[in-house]
Amino acid sequence: MPRKGPAPRRPLVADPVYNSPLVTQLVNKILLRGKRQLAETIVYEALEGCREKSGTDPVVTLKRAMDNVKPTLEVRSRRVGGATYQVPVEVRPARATTLGLRWLVTYARARREKTMVERLMNELLDASNGLGAAVKRREDTHKMAESNKAFAHYRW
């Protein structure tokens, strides 16, 4: 770590269509090989599809999906003596958002629909309704933290 401390977080610019930093983060997670225009098209079409299917504001749908996907606890490996313990720790808000978006995009890519727009749209709708693989991942993470609660005193 540098002597000056950690580098400051750069402010995230809100996207031009929905004026939401969360949508910008989602575009950045979808982005592959520098093709920002393609990533924006995928995200905007998926959000429009959410509007048509659910009849609500797509940013509200995205936020509700994120609330259902963001973890509050996770486990971190901690070596004590010769043993490695999975120690449950609370997740900082910025990391929770990053993990939630990462899981949404990962499990959207793994879906079986034909286009990425359909996959992302359906994963967002499932997550906003408390279903889907990303929500299951969060539940698994919480379950892991719960089962390792005995090692919570090893926190650092």
From Swiss-Prot:
Annotated Gene Ontology cellular component terms: small ribosomal subunit
Q: Which UniProt keywords apply?
A: Ribonucleoprotein, Ribosomal protein, RNA-binding, rRNA-binding, tRNA-binding
Q: Does the keyword Mitochondrion apply?
A: no
Task: List the GO biological process terms.
Answer: translation
Question: Which InterPro entries does this chain map to?
Answer: Ribosomal_uS7 (IPR000235), Ribosomal_uS7_bac/org-type (IPR005717), Ribosomal_uS7_CS (IPR020606), Ribosomal_uS7_dom (IPR023798), Ribosomal_uS7_dom_sf (IPR036823)
Please give the Gene Ontology molecular function terms for this protein.
rRNA binding; structural constituent of ribosome; tRNA binding
> Please, which domain of life does this record's source organism belong to?
Bacteria
Outline what the protein does: One of the primary rRNA binding proteins, it binds directly to 16S rRNA where it nucleates assembly of the head domain of the 30S subunit. Is located at the subunit interface close to the decoding center, probably blocks exit of the E-site tRNA.
Q: Which PANTHER family match?
A: RIBOSOMAL PROTEIN S7
Q: Tell me, how does this one assemble? A: Part of the 30S ribosomal subunit. Contacts proteins S9 and S11.
**Which family does the record assign?**
Belongs to the universal ribosomal protein uS7 family.
Protein name per the record: Small ribosomal subunit protein uS7
Source organism per entry reads Salinispora arenicola (strain CNS-205)
Q: Which gene encodes it?
A: rpsG
